[in-house]
């Protein structure tokens, strides 16, 4: 009989990088999150969907979100709960500020040891960095097997998974033992919509910091009455870490500048479609090394 699984989805609240302005970076080389609207990282939504599908295959399984960020990152935990997740953990502390992928993966791996897991699922990469490093780094730090570029979990039997992954020129089906880390592509199934009943049920979910800010609110009273509305908040004090590996101190990478690049044509040439025009275009493209 297949046992129930504790599935942890690594997710990130990211700035919407589709409209990056001059205020996108701080002088210290970190993202100015206050200057950009925040969204659920797209491929992490694909990861959430695969986790929820696996939960449905294994009765009794749970899906929890683990995200590292400021207090407002609790929003994506609530969003995940609206879609089917059971709860979440917000890893938040000023000591995490300035973390690159190395420091982030270290903090996440320490938190994962604290909360426990049978399977860790993450999006391939975050749109505010495009490194695709955090998932593999977490696997390395935890000593777990990793499967990247995943687009489907075909079977989950016993303590192993059969996974289809997307490669450059096709797909590959592999078997992997659990516990493991898998990172999920955008080619995986799109996340399911929010469920209206779950929205009504979990809209009151809060972290302790939010409760402390409004202790007499209706939301705070609802959380006090229902444990399932309590989102766990973890700080450096709650996990076993070497603080020299956190935040700025643990981050060898610094971003100097981010620009929104828009390519504009300086001139345009209209072609009639005649053979002579096409031949002339081919000569120009070859001469400019665009072709050939």
Where are the regions that the model predicts?
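N-terminal glycine-rich FAD/FM-binding segment characteristic of electron-transfer flavoproteins
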Residues: 1-292
